[in-house]
């Protein structure tokens, strides 16, 4: 049973603006972190909690929510912590210092996350595509969308109001994730985009970076305006 619309807790945080304000890399990378939960039970999960996990835990606590897990869209350091461009980024390893919670990852991404984020498999909960995670009475479907990385995944939040798709670096409002990085695969990306093209039009897309003036858009608009769907 999905949480009713008034129970859904959903917050979008922009790195360098809403947290990590003094972090120049956080400002440059414009990552989005999401908090998704059930207001009635007070449980929530964080999607891609990088840069300042403690601040994110505090932010949701101020809303009366407690973190019961984290979701990793993929292994890159700007999403889950690690080293990038010669900088060390806090992430899921530091989150575990503040909240001893499971980190939900796609099974194919486990070895990449272990290497990049410094978190052992004992803290990682591996999932297959189609798995459904319950947060209170809210349900989140985990969708394997390889291409940017082998175990990239998107999160479909079931909501009577129409649903939300948190897409990490698989799909942006304009464009898609790069396919020229370690573990990337252009053919898999095309297959993943075809899969996401089947997401209902009324679902709202929430990407992993603010690469467009808007922070989100209905899938109908994304399908109509994003050039990546011209080849679908």
Tell me the role of every PLM-derived stretch.
Residues 65, 115-119, 141-144, 149-232:
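Metallo-beta-lactamase
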Residues 43-47, 142-144:
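Short catalytic-loop micro-motif centered on adjacent basic/acidic residues
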Residues 49-53, 146-148:
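Short beta->alpha connector loops
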Residues 47, 103-107, 167, 207:
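Hydrophobic residues in well-ordered beta-strands that form the structural core
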Residues 12-33, 40, 114-122, 174-175, ...:
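Active-site-proximal loop/helix segment associated with metal-binding centers of metalloenzymes
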Residues 29, 52-139, 163, 224-228:
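Active-site HxH/HxHxD metal-binding segment of metal-dependent hydrolases
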Residues 12-18, 34-35, 130-160:
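Core dinuclear metal-dependent hydrolase active-site scaffold
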Residues 1-44, 51-63, 93-94:
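Zn-dependent metallo-beta-lactamase
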């Amino acid at each position: 049973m999905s949480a009713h619309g008034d129970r859904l807790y959903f917050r979008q945080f922009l790195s360098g603006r809403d947290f990590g304000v003094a972090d120049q890399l956080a400002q440059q990378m414009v990552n989005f972190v999401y908090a998704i939960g059930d207001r009635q039970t007070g449980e929530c999960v964080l999607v891609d909690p990088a840069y300042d996990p403690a601040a994110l835990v505090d932010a949701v606590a101020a809303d009366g929510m407690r973190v019961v897990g984290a979701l990793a869209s993929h292994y890159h350091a700007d999403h889950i912590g690690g080293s990038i461009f010669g900088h060390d980024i806090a992430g899921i390893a530091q989150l575990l210092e503040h909240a001893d919670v499971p980190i939900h990852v796609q099974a194919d991404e486990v070895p990449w996350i272990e290497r990049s984020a410094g978190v052992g498999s004992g803290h990682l909960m591996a999932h297959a595509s189609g798995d459904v995670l319950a947060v209170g009475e809210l349900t989140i479907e985990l969708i394997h969308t390889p291409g940017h990385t082998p175990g990239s995944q998107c999160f479909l939040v079931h909501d009577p109001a129409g649903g939300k798709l948190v897409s990490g670096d698989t799909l942006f409002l304009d464009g898609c994730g790069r396919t020229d990085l370690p573990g990337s695969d252009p053919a898999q990306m095309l297959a993943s985009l075809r899969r996401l093209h089947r997401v209902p039009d009324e679902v709202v897309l929430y990407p992993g970076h603010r690469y467009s003036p808007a922070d989100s858009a209905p899938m109908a608009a994304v399908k109509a305006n994003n050039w990546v769907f011209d080849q679908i």
